[in-house]
Amino acid sequence: MLSGNFMKMRPTSDGAGQALSDITTGLLPSLTYLADILPKESIVWKMKMLRTASSFVNSRLHAVKAQTLVLASGNDELLPSREEAERLDGMLQNCRIRHFRDNGHKILLEDEFDLATTIKGAGYYRRSRQTDFVSDYLPVTPDELEKAINRDRVLSFATDPVMLSTLPDGKIVRGLAGLPREGPVVLVGYHMLMGFELGPLVTGVLKSTGIHIRGLAHPFLFSKSSEQILPDPSAHDLHRIMGAVPVTPVNFYKLLSEKHFVLLYPGGAREALHRKGEEYKLFWPEQSEFVRMASRFGATIIPFGAVGEDDICDVLLDYNDLLKLPFYDILDKRLNEDAPKLRTDSTGEVKNQDMHPVVVTPKVPGRFYFVFGKPIETRGREKELRDKEKAQHLYLHVKSEVESCIEYLKEKREEDPYRSILHRLLYQAAHGSDTEIPTFEP
């Protein structure tokens, strides 16, 4: 019954280890008396009792309504944890599964496993009866941040992101000196293909400045239906751990009221899952959405641009191509039939917020570039921006600034001698792997 991965268990002190060894050694002679204490008839009776109890529990699992989180060890040598987890998921009304491929039977005793992080990632931590994605959130820990950075380490190494910001006087500098240090702030920008920019952006800003960006994300990332479709149910846990919340007016209001830095992509899924030839094209609603809410709290609006997706891959099959494939309509229905609907009252391409995969072909990696534009203050302009026309004018100005940021980066990256990973590898070979690699002059 002690089957487990002892290599991953938390080490004990020498004294405790010796005491455990002495106790175990002392118990060995007592094992010979087990046959007298537990005769065959007793064992048979206990097995029958266990089967009866198991049948009783299984017959009532469907009535359990409480939130249930099932942890399934992939390396469990004692019980078929993965199979049992799938069975429970089909019987319990409010169940979510988290698979741990490399963990053993005693997963809770293993050093690398963090139960609190797992609960946070599943969205099961709450402070009250009702789930509140804003107030329920627990700040990311140093270990969680390190794991998030490690998860994107390959992408960050391959793209070596360059971050620029704009000072209040309009001067563009390398680094994040142009970002305000206090909220509320709304970061509004372009959503790269498949959200490639999210990891380097959120973790890079947090590690460099201590500013924790809270993203407004598609509700699909928080739904159980998405977990049942994806190969890994925990694929989106990191977004929750890093502070993402479903994009709703209420959540936006709460984040601004608590003076957070809020990351907003008006183009949403249509922008992140764009078609061939649509890179760096904005798909924003025609009418302003965030301006009046931002002005209500005196939030600073910072437009930003991000480029580099076309330097790491090309779109091979987009949504239009997938719809022509045999049987894809089955997957399309599973992805979107029960998914939360966004932009239903919008016009134009932005209303097409269907979720779907994108098939890409990789390229020799180039480089990611970010530039945060000049901060736009709304403090003291609440009455002015209540006027729809003035709010719309500011909205279009923000959109224009985002487009200008993108064009600026597309032009300036041509001047970067280290845009290619090959040139960066040669530079690091000569100057050391920890050396910051130069880029163009802002």
What are these regions (language model features)?
Residues L2-L61:
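Conserved alpha/beta-hydrolase catalytic His-Asp/Glu region
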Residues T117, G123-V154, K254-P442:
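Non-catalytic C-terminal accessory region of glycerolipid acyltransferases
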Residues E77-E84:
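Conserved alpha/beta-hydrolase "acid-adjacent" motif
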Residues A63-K65, V70-D76:
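Short beta-strand/loop motif that positions the catalytic acidic residue
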Residues G183-F252, S257-E258, A269-E286:
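Catalytic core of membrane glycerolipid acyltransferases/transacylases, capturing the structured
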Residues G74-E77, D102-G104:
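Acidic beta-to-alpha connecting loop that harbors the catalytic carboxylate
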Residues E86, L92-L138:
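Catalytic active-site module of serine/aspartate enzymes centered on a nucleophile-bearing elbow/loop
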Residues D160-H191:
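Helix-to-loop junction immediately C-terminal to a conserved catalytic motif
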